[in-house]
């Protein structure tokens, strides 16, 4: 199951050529239940669509946010993996989902803005929430070596300034077939299954199947609600001085 949690510019359903009648904004408004908006995509993947371009979806109150997560806890569907696709940056919404996740996978390109965003996210999660383990996906690289070099660049910075443990999860090649798949509104692994990006993504999926499940309660949606209610929003906390 995939939650499109880029709550301001959600578009997973559009990219896959699916038509979502209702979305998370209708759930928040009390017009329907979460189970009513779930749509099925390729290979049986279930998708929870968000509301693209709706400002209040990107600025949920703590009460709305908690209610939304409780709705996830009430789902009866059998879920193998629950993937949360967040926006870039360090908004409270991104941080909340990251804190609830069992594994945090950071997708980064070899560009200054992408590297800066990745480091900023790891910095806040490490220093403010005591999260040290991050999986890195080097995206749109020209070779495995370029992806490895990007990972080493990130590792050197985090080792110097943060108490963080990074793992290179995958290197996804720069592949024009990804763009072509988006134009066709299909998954690249479906439209072009034997291309470099598709093979790399399949390899990442197989690798994810072997990731160990932590023994602590983190990663459960009910635990997410508890954490959300215990921690104050960052805007209410005293600023942290460097």
Residue spans for each PLM region:
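Short beta-strand "acidic-cap" motif of Rossmann-like dinucleotide-binding folds
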Residues: 1-4, 107
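Conserved catalytic-core segment of NTP-binding enzymes
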Residues: 81, 86-180
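C-terminal boundary of histidine-terminating zinc-finger modules
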Residues: 182-201
């Amino acid at each position: 199951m995939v939650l499109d949690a880029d709550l301001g510019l959600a578009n997973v359903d559009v990219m896959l050529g699916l038509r979502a009648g209702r979305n998370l904004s209708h759930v928040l408004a009390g017009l329907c239940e979460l189970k009513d908006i779930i749509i099925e995509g390729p290979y049986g993947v279930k998708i929870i669509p968000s509301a693209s371009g709706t400002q209040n979806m990107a600025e949920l109150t703590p009460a709305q946010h908690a209610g939304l997560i409780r709705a996830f806890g009430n789902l009866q569907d059998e879920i193998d993996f629950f993937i949360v696709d967040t926006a870039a940056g360090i908004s409270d919404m991104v941080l909340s989902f990251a804190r609830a996740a069992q594994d945090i996978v950071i997708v980064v390109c070899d560009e200054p803005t992408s590297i800066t965003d990745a480091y900023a996210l790891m910095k806040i999660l490490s220093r403010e929430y005591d999260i040290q383990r991050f999986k890195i996906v080097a995206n749109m690289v020209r070779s495995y070596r370029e992806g490895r070099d990007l990972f080493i660049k990130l590792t050197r910075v985090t080792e110097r300034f943060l108490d963080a443990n990074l793992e290179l999860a995958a290197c996804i090649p720069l592949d024009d077939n990804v763009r072509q798949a988006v134009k066709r509104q299909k998954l690249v692994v479906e439209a072009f299954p034997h291309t470099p990006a598709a093979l790399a993504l399949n390899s990442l999926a197989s690798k994810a199947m072997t990731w160990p499940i932590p023994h602590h309660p983190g990663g459960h949606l009910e635990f997410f609600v508890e954490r959300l209610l215990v921690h104050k929003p960052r805007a209410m906390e005293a600023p942290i001085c460097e």
